[in-house]
Amino acid sequence: MISRIDHVSIAVKDYERALRFFSKLLGAVPGVGMEDPNMKYVWQIFSLGDLSRLELMHPTGSGSFLDGFLSKREGGVHHITLETPDIEKLRAFLEEEEIPYFGRADLGETWKELFIHPRDAFGVLIQVAEFHPDDWLGDSEKMPPGQRFSVAKSGDGCTVTVAHPGGGKVSIPLNASEARRLADEISSCLD
């Protein structure tokens, strides 16, 4: 029902300072971001390492839904986003188990979501969403469209890079012996 933790969302007052901290100091790579004028905030996804992601959010003016959260702090973890392959199946499960949810939204194939309030989730705001993870990542953090793997010469062997089902890509350096063994095992599967 839940595929994985997709990202941790951090709300901040000082976006430029947070951007410098996460991208310049910790190496987070910017991905997709957007401003929501109705809710008066901006969000942006960042990739850390090979599969970890975080989201930075900040208000764009007074009346933002983040005002209450940021009224007593400079920033902090706002919510955790979990990925599901089927939001309707999850919704039905929550109703069956009498777990309240709110904020259900359906943006078509791009994004479907609902939230579980912290009072019903042990103090944590949980966003559950159905989406295509690669849609939210920067190009350098994912395989090109239609490509699921690549192999490149490196040192005395090669580096195999594969698309990850949770979005992004993972690279595995292999020495010459490991590369030959992998090629032999793949070949034997095809015989």
Q: Where are these predicted regions, by residue range?
A:
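Short, extreme N-terminal leader segments that mark the start of a protein/domain
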Residues: 1-13, 21
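Short, structured motif recognition centered on aromatic/hydrophobic residues
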Residues: 5, 22, 51-57, 77-84, ...
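Ordered, amphipathic secondary-structure segments that act as subunit-interaction surfaces
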Residues: 75-98
